[in-house]
């Protein structure tokens, strides 16, 4: 069983989706660009994980997820070593539309992803991190079904 950390921003559809995750550590983030990254790095420095799955919401998607392949800070970009194609396949097999994206945004999500990837690259290169954008709750037709299937994908990754 893989040791997984799942992060989600407080008071978002991401937080609602991760409720009920078992056998993984959950880190809820306060929606503060600086504090979010600091809290993640503090957690990573105190405990080793095989995988970090960060979840944030994106306003312009409906009933699907975007699996982010990279994060950017200015002219720098860092790609993930997580198998994003496999993750897209797992979501689709669970009945959730998914696509690869190379745009983690320009604010909280991207900032967390960039600094998380940078920390892992420098301090824990064997660990993998991926960022998944989910819709706002109002943009998910059947939220409970979406949540159950989303948790099924996380459970599959845990058990690899």
Spans of features found by a protein language model:
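Short active-site-adjacent structural elements
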Residues: 138-142
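N-terminal catalytic or cofactor-binding beta/alpha core of small enzyme domains
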Residues: 1-106, 117-128, 144-148, 157-159
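An accessory alpha-helical subdomain
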Residues: 133-136
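Buried hydrophobic packing segments
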Residues: 112-116
């Amino acid at each position: 069983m893989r040791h997984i950390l799942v992060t989600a921003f407080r008071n978002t559809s991401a937080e609602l989706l991760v409720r009920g995750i078992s056998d993984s550590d959950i880190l809820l983030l306060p929606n503060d660009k600086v504090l979010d990254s600091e809290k993640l790095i503090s957690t990573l420095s105190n405990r080793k994980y095989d995988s970090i799955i960060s979840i944030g919401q994106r306003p312009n998607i409906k009933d699907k997820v975007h699996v982010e392949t990279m994060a950017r800070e200015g002219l720098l970009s860092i790609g993930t070593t997580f198998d994003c194609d496999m993750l897209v396949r797992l979501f689709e097999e669970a009945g959730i539309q998914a696509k690869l994206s190379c745009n983690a945004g320009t604010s909280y999500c991207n900032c967390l992803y960039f600094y998380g990837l940078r920390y892992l690259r420098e301090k824990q290169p064997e660990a993998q991190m991926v960022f998944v954008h989910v819709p706002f709750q109002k943009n998910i037709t059947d939220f409970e079904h979406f949540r159950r299937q989303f948790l099924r994908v996380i459970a599959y990754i845990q058990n690899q």
